[in-house]
Amino acid sequence: MNTYAFNRELRLLTPEHYQNVFQQAHRAGSPHFTIIARNNKLSHPRLGLAVPKKQIKTAVGRNRFKRLARESFRNNQHQLPNKDFVVIAKKSAQDLSNEELFKLFDKLWHRLSRPSRG
């Protein structure tokens, strides 16, 4: 049976982890947020979040976006490849409903799960 926890091992924790993702990364984006991915040598995917105050002004909005991103990742982690993902919010993300955000996350997770053509 699959577990759907979001443990510490599923998170990007240090600045070095984030910098590694930004080098040689694959991107999938929308007008509302971008997901950057890079292969890792682990047996599971990991998630990092970047939600700048400049993009989403209120703490409530930033926390909502992060909560929904983590929940979407947690629910899809068993279908995702072994990559490190960084989700970067854009200003218009705060205007979407929870359902719209989940649909968009699912679409981008699926796009990043496909094998590369390169």
UniProtKB/Swiss-Prot annotation:
It is an enzyme of class 3 (hydrolase). Pfam families: Ribonuclease_P. One of its GO terms (molecular function) is 3'-tRNA processing endoribonuclease activity. InterPro entries: Ribosomal_Su5_D2-typ_SF, Ribsml_uS5_D2-typ_fold_subgr, RNase_P, RNase_P_CS. It comes from the Bacteria. It catalyses: Endonucleolytic cleavage of RNA, removing 5'-extranucleotides from tRNA precursor. One of its GO terms (cellular component) is ribonuclease P complex. Keywords: Endonuclease, Hydrolase, Nuclease, RNA-binding, tRNA processing. Its EC number is 3.1.26.5. Coiled coil: none annotated. GO terms for biological process: tRNA 5'-leader removal. HAMAP family: RNase_P (MF_00227). RNaseP catalyzes the removal of the 5'-leader sequence from pre-tRNA to produce the mature 5'-terminus. It can also cleave other RNA substrates such as 4.5S RNA. The protein component plays an auxiliary but essential role in vivo by binding to the 5'-leader sequence and broadening the substrate specificity of the ribozyme. Consists of a catalytic RNA component (M1 or rnpB) and a protein subunit. Belongs to the RnpA family. PANTHER family: RIBONUCLEASE P PROTEIN COMPONENT. This is Ribonuclease P protein component. It comes from Vibrio campbellii (strain ATCC BAA-1116). The lineage of its organism: Bacteria, Pseudomonadati, Pseudomonadota, Gammaproteobacteria, Vibrionales.
